[in-house]
Structures are given as structure tokens and as C-alpha cells.
Amino acid sequence: MLDPINWEAATDEAVNNLIRLIRVESVNPPGNEEPAVLLVKEILEREGFPGEAITIVEAAPKRANLVARLRGDGSQRPLMLSGHVDVVPVEREHWSRDPFGGEVHNGCVWGRGALDMKGFLAMYLQIFLLAYRRQQPLKRDLILAAIADEEAGFEHGSRFLVDEHRDLINAEYALNEGGAMTIHAAGKRLYPIQVAEKGVCLLRMSASGEPGIGSVPNTDNAVLQLSNALHRLGRARHLSIHSTPKLRKMLESLSSQLGFPLGILLNMMISPAIAGLM
């Protein structure tokens, strides 16, 4: 039987790793994510994680990506924990604290990337370290990915890995950023869940009409029919909203914690009649 996890010690370790990550200035543009990726590698190797299970690939000089793999028994496909190490630029004059200082103040870690998304990466790294230390039997491989170039187009990061090194990151499930930003409301700390981002809906449209020639146009030709349809689609502002079971469960849970009036408003969002008006 596995020993209980000392969550206080694990939290302290994750915070310390986050501070170290923030102090690496991996601003994108220009990128230069290599030092942050090498820091993750150093933390893993210091723990004794085998070097042959860590892969670093560069899409361009200094644009590095790290993928580490903890083996399971292979009965299920892998789970990937993925976080980007690059951050957006800073305007230091607008900061009350050093954006790359990683200071702890009022119970929070301050710095560029604390939320987006070195904080996530530090948590994923901690989970990965705990699973390795405990030698916990896994049904699937656990993949840790520290990725470049999320902030400026993905070309040197996730897109590069998908196009050139898909074997390293091929997984059944992936946890990334989004959703788990802390919400402080009604004196409570709440953690929402985000299942996915907006996607793409590909449509194929066809039309039929009366043929004709340019010198004698008619209002029933196929091109005009398609043009009218595209115009109506472009003007649509209130397309149908489809809430997933996971979203409804999250909103119900949040509403029960928030009480009146915020909880009532969240419950209204679940109502199909109200959601269609929002």
C-alpha cells in the first residue's frame, strides 16, 4: 500500500519550482525557451529520472521542447500533461513587483507566467515527480511536455511536435491550460473546469438555380443563392448554445457554493431558455 502524500511538502516544492521557472525570462517574442526547458530537465534528473526517458527537440536554435515519459503497463493509451514555458512581454513600469522576481507576497507567487502558464507547468511537474517517486503502478504512460512558442503561433512548439515528433506526444488524453484559474467569490476559493476551446465547424454548402449568361442575369442562379446564404450566416449573432454535461455539473457545483445572488445567476445560465438569450 502506498504511503499518504505529504501535500504540504509537495506544495512547497511546487512553489519553489514555480519561482525558479518565473526567474527564467522566456519572453516570446523572441522566445529562447531553452533555459526554461533545461531547468525542467535539471529538476527531473536531480530526482533520478532516467535521462533516456527525457527528449529535447528544437524547432529552431534556442526554441526547445521537452518531453519526458513515465512508463505504465501499456494497457491504456498515454495521458499527457502539457505546459508552455514561454510568456508574453512585460511593461516593467506597470508592475509593482519584479515580473521575473518570483516573489511570494500575501500567499501568492508574483511574476510573469505565474498564471500563464508556468504555474500549471509547476503543478504538472509536481504530479509527474510524485508518480515517479512513489513508483505507483500506472495503466498508461504519463507524459510531461514543456513546450515552446504558445504565445506567438505554435510554429516552434506544439505544431512542430505534432508535425515532426508525433510519436513523442501521441496520447489518448491531454491536460493543458484553461479553466483552472482560481476564482475568489463569496469569501471562497473556487476552481472552474474548462473542457475545450472553441473549435472549427466545417460546412459544405450547395445550391441549385436557373442557369444563364452574364449579359442576361437572373435572380435564381446558384451563385446568388450561395451568396445570400453566406451573408445570412455572417450576420448570425445568436447561434444555438449547447451546454455539455460537464459544464452543467460544474455550474451546479459552483452555484451551490456561491449562494444568493451569484448562485441563482449561474443556475439561470444552465436553463436552455435563458442561455439562448445570452
Per-range role (PLM):
Residues R166-Y173, G179-K188, I193-L202, G214-M278:
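Acidic-enriched catalytic cores of C-N bond-cleaving enzymes acting on peptides and small amides
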Residues G83-V85, E177-G179, A207:
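Fold-independent oxyanion-binding glycine-rich loops
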Residues I56-A59, E150, I193-K198:
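Short Gly/Pro-enriched turn/cap motifs at secondary-structure boundaries
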Residues I19, L38-K41, A122-L129, R159-V162, ...:
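Predominant activation on well-ordered alpha-helical scaffold segments within soluble catalytic domains
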Residues C108-V109, L115-P192:
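Acidic/histidine-rich catalytic neighborhood of metal-dependent amide-processing enzymes
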Residues N28, L115, G209-S215:
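A generic structural motif
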Residues L2-R112, R133-R140:
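Acidic/His- and Gly-rich active-site-bordering loop/insert found
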